[in-house]
Amino acid sequence: MSPDLTHRSPEELTPEDSQAIGDLARRAARADGVDPLNEESLLALRHRTPGRVHVLAHDQDRLVGYGTLAHGSAEVVTDPDARKAGLGGRLLDALLEHDPELLLWAHGDMDGGRRLAASRGMVPRRPLWRMERPVAGEFSELPPVELPEGISVRPFVAGQDDEAWLRVNSRAFADHAEQGRMTAEDLTARTQEDWFDASGFLLLVDDTRDGEVVGFHWTKVDQLPVGEVYVVGVDPERQGEGLGRVATLVGLHHLADRGVETVELYVDGDNRAAVTTYGRLGFERAAVDVQYGPPV
């Protein structure tokens, strides 16, 4: 008997639904070695973020599949014991009914994700690289931080710096599908996560302009010994001053001081300038996610 599909609005999601989806994602991650849902999707579950589509697949009382869609971006996850029976395709079709032009994430770009995308006529549209570098042990020495004259570094202060950071973030990521649309609510949700540490949310400020925020490096340590370059940004008005490299190094030194041994980051594989910059800082590609969509 085929699993039953149920559509849920964010308001209709129950705590039991969210728990079951989290359990399903963990089962899939153990089997595949990669998380099937990104941070935005997981936060949306916890906070029941408006405007998101949820499709749940139950085999009797057991959740065996889940699909989610928001802002034209979709993810699908199936239970390892319920695969190769067309369930992933059914979930994707349900999401395509809401948005025929959606883009589908294939985390880890494994064979199953490729086949699912190809079965619906989708082609690779956007590669997202995970890059890594050591910050402890042999061959891990970091270049020194050389702050430009007039620039200093301080931690983010919640309730004081929100508006200034959101302004720089939206300008720095105006062309970025996810990061550029971050709202005050999104910022607050992340600062309330267990991993959040204000001392690792570092702002570059211009002391000659009343402490104006001109760049930032938000680091993340969820579980040692791995840390993350969560997001680095520089105000476009200040590009060309070397602040991107400075911000990156400030955060890397902070992570090393916290006891992190390996730092990872995510970058669009098509962004050759960013890939080159990170490569010069010792980062190498470790994995890739691919977003699939209709042919352009």
From Swiss-Prot:
Where are its TM segments located? none
Q: Which residues bind acetyl-CoA 2?
A: V232, G233, V234, Q239, G240, E241, G242, L243, G244, R245
Q: Which CDD domains match?
A: NAT_SF
Q: Name one Pfam family in it.
A: Acetyltransf_1
Task: Give the EC class as a word.
Answer: transferase
Subunit structure of this chain's protein: Monomer.
Q: Which GO terms describe its molecular function?
A: mycothiol synthase activity; protein-N-terminal-alanine acetyltransferase activity
- Locate the N-acetyltransferase domain: which residues? 8-146, 151-296
Gene Ontology BP terms: mycothiol biosynthetic process
Question: Which Gene3D superfamilies does the entry link to?
Answer: 3.40.630.30
> Does the keyword field hold Transferase?
yes
Q: What does this protein do?
A: Catalyzes the transfer of acetyl from acetyl-CoA to desacetylmycothiol (Cys-GlcN-Ins) to form mycothiol.
NCBIfam families from the UniProt entry: mycothiol_MshD (TIGR03448)
* Record-stated family: Belongs to the acetyltransferase family. MshD subfamily.
**Which keywords does the record carry?**
Acyltransferase, Repeat, Transferase
PANTHER family, per the entry: L-AMINO ACID N-ACETYLTRANSFERASE, MYCOTHIOL ACETYLTRANSFERASE
Protein origin, superkingdom: Bacteria
Reaction(s) this enzyme catalyzes, per UniProt: 1D-myo-inositol 2-(L-cysteinylamino)-2-deoxy-alpha-D-glucopyranoside + acetyl-CoA = mycothiol + CoA + H(+)
* Protein residues bound to 1D-myo-inositol 2-(L-cysteinylamino)-2-deoxy-alpha-D-glucopyranoside: E39, E178, K220, E228, Y266
Entry EC number(s): 2.3.1.189
PROSITE patterns documented for this protein: GNAT
Give the protein name, as stated in the record.
Mycothiol acetyltransferase
Residues reported in the UniProt entry to bind acetyl-CoA 1: V76, V77, T78
Coiled-coil intervals in this record?
none
Q: Native species of this protein?
A: Kytococcus sedentarius (strain ATCC 14392 / DSM 20547 / JCM 11482 / CCUG 33030 / NBRC 15357 / NCTC 11040 / CCM 314 / 541) (Micrococcus sedentarius)
